[in-house]
Amino acid sequence: MSNLSRKQQTQKRHRRLRRHLKGTAQRPRLAVFRSNNHIYAQVIDDEAQNTLCAASTLDKDLRTSLKADGSSCDASNAVGDLVAKRALAKGIQQVVFDRGGNLYHGRVKSLADAAREAGLQF
């Protein structure tokens, strides 16, 4: 049995993942952060250390169109679609998916599926 809390387990998984994930200019990293109320996605170039584009449930574009709060799978679908459109507008077609220590399930999975359907490759 693990004596770590759920948050500590997530942080441990995130550190383990980040050892191997690197975003480049040709293939930046799509980083996902999930809180209790919202979900955030950023496309990051780790070599230049800058964010190329981002989307979240707090965006003005999405706040008006979302019926429920930002903690649903529908909201995650909208964020995945929006971040993919913004990335494709900047000429980014391939990314490395960084789930941020979260399990690939639920809101994180729906964001990834929506980004794939919108045209991002990972």
Curated annotation (Swiss-Prot):
Biased composition (Basic residues): 9-22
GO biological process: translation
Gene Ontology molecular function: 5S rRNA binding; structural constituent of ribosome
InterPro entries: Ribosomal_uL18_bac-type, Ribosomal_uL18_bac/euk
Keywords assigned: Ribonucleoprotein, Ribosomal protein, RNA-binding, rRNA-binding
Source organism superkingdom: Bacteria
Chain positions covered by the region annotation Disordered: 1-26
Matches recorded under Pfam families: Ribosomal_L18p
A GO term from the CC aspect: cytosolic large ribosomal subunit
Assembly and oligomerization: Part of the 50S ribosomal subunit; part of the 5S rRNA/L5/L18/L25 subcomplex. Contacts the 5S and 23S rRNAs.
Cited NCBIfam families: L18_bact (TIGR00060)
Family annotation (HAMAP family): Ribosomal_uL18_B
Protein family: Belongs to the universal ribosomal protein uL18 family.
Role description: This is one of the proteins that bind and probably mediate the attachment of the 5S RNA into the large ribosomal subunit, where it forms part of the central protuberance.
Name this polypeptide is given: Large ribosomal subunit protein uL18
Species for this entry: Prochlorococcus marinus (strain MIT 9313)
